[in-house]
Swiss-Prot record:
It holds the Pfam family F-box. This is Putative F-box/kelch-repeat protein At1g61540. Keywords: Kelch repeat, Repeat. The keyword Cell membrane does not apply. InterPro entries: F-box-like_dom_sf, F-box/kelch-repeat_ARATH, F-box_dom, Kelch-typ_b-propeller. Residues 24-70 form the F-box domain. CDD domains: F-box_AtAFR-like (cd22152). SMART domains: FBOX. PROSITE patterns: FBOX. Kelch repeats lie at residues 135-189, 191-240, 246-293. SUPFAM superfamilies: F-box domain (SSF81383), Kelch motif (SSF117281).
Length: 402
């Protein structure tokens, strides 16, 4: 039909608009405050790995603001630190967790990673080491030097502090008295109590010193005037234990300091077996730790985990702990509080190799009734391989809140 309009004009096809491709938003482009909030919700176990991503991440992870937010949100974790003395240097490690995509099959994903430590610090086995809050305090120490033909020992009064948030070291005010490796240290209500290990007379005013981290000042505590215990082994020492808001001291006498009464008094013979928890040369104790104000040990002979019941002054078996390898031939064992759980470390020497493996297990705890505590092995795995000369016998395990 020439010249006539078609009955229905065909609609012209309009070209479809090409899809707009939006570039993915990089986490690096997020505002700093938002990143802080995101990181505060992540477990501290992942921080060592995250710090390797970029300088920005590393800056956030070591910032004071991050840990203030974590504290306000009640997101703090208890983290495990392990220190090996080796030669004149010390090697510090912390337990962390690998990202899920990097975890091998049948692996727990946990490992110990090294923390920077400056040269020049006195060997840790000659010092007293303890944690308060997010800081590890390395107190005193022994340094040997040669004077003419004689080898002499010098004690130190210095205090080095590792901030476990930034992994930076600093110096704290020194003690009034220099102390060596035979000093004993404990923590009660956020204060550090260190005794002995000095050349002062046993009745000296400064035989016990007290450090308050809040005021950064040293003070003294009434002296119990107990002598060194001579049957601990090759060294004469006094041992201490901070538990239930009290200080227990074990030497020639066994005494306890009650802060409410402001006095020392002898503990009853029914509590003498508490001594097994602090004496590494004890026939019973292999290692010990305090979790939620309950004292736990690993029995050397039976390799059974036990806890101390103050009501009846007896050690009771921790029920339900199954699945761990036989620890009787694993050398020295360490235990430490891991946020309401027990972390257990032991070593394994590889035959014909100069390598030693460090194993770690995590045991969760449950109180049933009031007279029973049950444990469950959550996982155990190899977390570190070191030179065979490293030994848990001289190592320190510390639990830090960050």
């Amino acid at each position: 039909m020439n010249g006539e309009k078609p009955l229905r004009e065909r609609k012209k096809k309009m070209p479809y608009p090409s899809p707009v491709t939006e570039e993915p938003i990089s986490i690096m482009s997020l505002p700093y405050d938002l990143l802080l909030n995101c990181f505060s919700l992540v477990s501290r176990l992942y921080y060592p790995t995250l710090s390797l991503v970029s300088k920005t991440f590393r800056s956030i992870i070591t910032s004071r603001e991050l840990y203030e937010i974590r504290s306000r949100l009640n997101r703090t974790d208890k983290c495990l630190y392990l220190c090996f003395p080796y030669d004149m240097n010390t090697h510090w490690f912390t337990l962390c967790r690998e990202p899920n995509r990097n975890v091998a099959e049948n692996s727990s994903g946990y490992l110990l990673v090294q923390v920077p430590s400056p040269n020049g610090l006195l060997p840790v086995h000659s010092s007293s080491v303890i944690a308060v809050g997010s800081n590890i305090y390395k107190i005193g120490g022994t340094k040997s030097y040669r004077h003419k033909l004689w080898k002499r020992t010098r004690y130190s009064s210095s205090v080095s502090v590792l901030d476990c948030r930034s992994h930076r070291w600093r110096q704290a005010p020194g003690m009034r008295v220099a102390r060596g490796c035979s000093s004993t240290v404990c923590e009660v209500d956020g204060k550090i109590y260190i005794a002995g290990g000095c050349k002062e007379d046993i009745g000296s005013l400064y035989w016990i010193e007290v450090f308050d981290p809040k005021t950064q000042t040293w003070g003294t505590l009434k002296n119990p005037c107990i002598e060194y215990q001579h049957d601990i082994g090759y060294r004469c020492e006094v041992k201490s234990l901070g538990l239930d808001g009290k200080i227990y001291m074990f030497g020639s006498e066994f005494v306890v300091y009650n802060f409410e009464e402001d006095r020392w008094k002898c503990i009853g013979r029914d509590k003498y077996n508490l001594y097994h928890a602090v004496d590494p040369m004890s026939r019973i104790n292999s290692s010990s730790c305090v979790v939620d104000n309950v004292l736990f040990i690993l029995d050397k002979g039976t390799r059974v985990f036990k806890w101390y019941d103050f009501k009846v002054s007896l050690w009771k078996e921790l029920n339900g702990v199954e699945g761990l390898p036989d620890l009787s031939d694993r050398g020295y064992v360490k235990m430490v509080d891991l946020g309401g759980k027990i972390a257990v470390l032991w070593q394994e020497c590889l035959t014909n190799k100069k390598i030693k493996r460090i194993w770690c297990a995590e045991i969760s705890l449950e109180r049933r009734d009031r007279d029973e505590i049950w444990g469950k092995v959550e996982w155990f795995d190899i977390v570190l391989s070191v030179h065979s000369s490293f030994s848990l016998l001289c190592a320190d395990t510390i639990s830090v809140v960050v």
